[in-house]
Amino acid sequence: MRIVVAGIGPGSREDITPAVMQAVSESDVVVGYKYYFQFIEPYLSSKAVCVDSGMRKERERALEAFNYAMEGLNVCVISS
């Protein structure tokens, strides 16, 4: 189990680093603000669970990430 917090950059797929691409592709669960998923979609595993939410839900997303990690899953929290 692990939690990776990955910054996706200022808002373009071209700004996403190889390390973030790898973290996303290796994750069982990806948690983040729903708008950000459009930038990482090509890197998601077909088996990944995506947990998205709206603005100002940072605490809820953090709790979701910890809950999934406590189940033994690899979690990536995407941020900008």
Task: Tell me what each language-model feature is.
Residues 1-80:
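Class I S-adenosyl-L-methionine
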